[in-house]
C-alpha cells in the first residue's frame, strides 16, 4: 500500500454517509479542534456489515457526496480505503490499512455514540481498540454512560455535538416524501441527490420541493 503524507494526529471519520450531512461535518470539526488533529479523513464504508437489512446507496454515490461535502475544508479529505478493499467493511480492517498508509500517525476514530453502544459486537473488538483512540460523538437527548460499555468504557471519549441531532435516516425519509433537505446537507449534496434521483421511491421521477 502506498504511503501518504504524514499527519502526526489523524482523525478517522468512519460512516455510511447515506447521505453525509452537516452533523457529520460539525462533529468532525469539533473533534479536530478538541483533539488538535492535523487532518480528518472521512472513510465511507464499502459494504456496511451491520446494515444488511436495508438497501444502502451505491458506494460510489456515497463517496462522491462525501467528497463534495468536504471539498471546501482544507483540513478534511476522503479515503476510498474501505470501498476499494471490497467485501464487508470492518473497522479493524480500516484501522490496519490506515496504519500502513500513515505509519507515524496517531489515529483517532470518530463515530456516533449509538454505534459505540454496539461496539462489543464489532469484529476483533479488543484488537480494534488498541489501534486508535475512540471518540464517541453524542447528540442532545441521547444518553450513553461509559459503564454501559463495560470494560471498553475507559477507552472511549464522549463529545456532545448539538448538530448531530440531524440524521441520515431522517434525510432519506424527507427525500422520499418529496420534502426539502436544504440546510440539512451541504448545497452540493442536495444537488447531487436531486440529479441522481437518490432516495426516491421506485418509479418516482422528480423531487422538486427538494430545491
From Swiss-Prot:
Biological or metabolic pathway of the protein: Cofactor biosynthesis; NAD(+) biosynthesis; deamido-NAD(+) from nicotinate D-ribonucleotide: step 1/1
Keywords in alphabetical order: ATP-binding, NAD, Nucleotide-binding, Nucleotidyltransferase, Pyridine nucleotide biosynthesis, Transferase
Catalytic reaction(s) noted: nicotinate beta-D-ribonucleotide + ATP + H(+) = deamido-NAD(+) + diphosphate
One Gene Ontology biological process: NAD biosynthetic process
Superkingdom to which the source organism belongs: Bacteria
The EC number(s) this enzyme carries: 2.7.7.18
GO molecular function list: ATP binding; nicotinate-nucleotide adenylyltransferase activity
NCBIfam families: cyt_tran_rel, nicotinate (nicotinamide) nucleotide adenylyltransferase, PRK00071.1-3
Similarity-based family: Belongs to the NadD family.
Described purpose of this protein according to its UniProt entry: Catalyzes the reversible adenylation of nicotinate mononucleotide (NaMN) to nicotinic acid adenine dinucleotide (NaAD).
Protein name: Probable nicotinate-nucleotide adenylyltransferase
Amino acid at each position: 500500500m502506498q504511503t501518504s503524507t504524514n499527519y502526526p494526529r489523524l482523525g478517522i471519520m468512519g460512516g455510511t454517509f447515506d447521505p453525509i450531512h452537516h452533523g457529520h461535518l460539525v462533529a468532525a470539526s469539533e473533534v479536530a479542534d478538541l483533539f488538535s488533529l492535523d487532518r480528518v479523513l472521512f472513510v465511507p464504508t464499502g459494504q456496511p456489515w451491520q446494515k444488511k437489512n436495508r438497501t444502502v446507496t451505491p458506494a460510489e454515490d456515497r463517496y462522491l457526496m462525501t467528497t463534495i461535502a468536504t471539498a471546501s475544508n482544507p483540513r478534511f479529505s476522503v479515503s476510498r480505503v474501505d470501498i476499494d478493499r471490497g467485501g464487508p467493511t470492518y473497522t479493524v480492517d480500516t484501522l490496519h490499512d490506515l496504519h500502513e498508509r500513515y505509519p507515524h500517525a496517531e489515529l483517532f476514530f470518530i463515530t456516533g455514540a449509538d454505534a459505540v453502544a454496539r461496539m462489543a459486537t464489532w469484529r476483533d473488538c479488543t484488537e480494534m481498540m488498541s489501534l486508535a483512540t475512540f471518540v464517541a460523538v453524542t447528540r442532545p437527548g441521547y444518553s450513553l454512560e461509559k459503564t454501559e460499555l463495560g470494560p471498553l468504557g475507559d477507552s472511549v471519549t464522549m463529545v456532545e455535538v448539538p448538530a448531530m441531532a440531524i440524521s441520515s435516516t431522517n434525510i432519506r425519509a424527507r427525500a422520499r416524501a418529496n420534502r426539502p433537505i436544504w440546510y440539512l446537507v451541504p448545497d452540493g449534496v442536495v444537488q447531487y441527490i436531486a440529479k441522481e434521483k437518490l432516495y426516491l421511491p421506485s418509479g418516482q421521477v422528480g423531487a422538486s420541493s427538494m430545491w
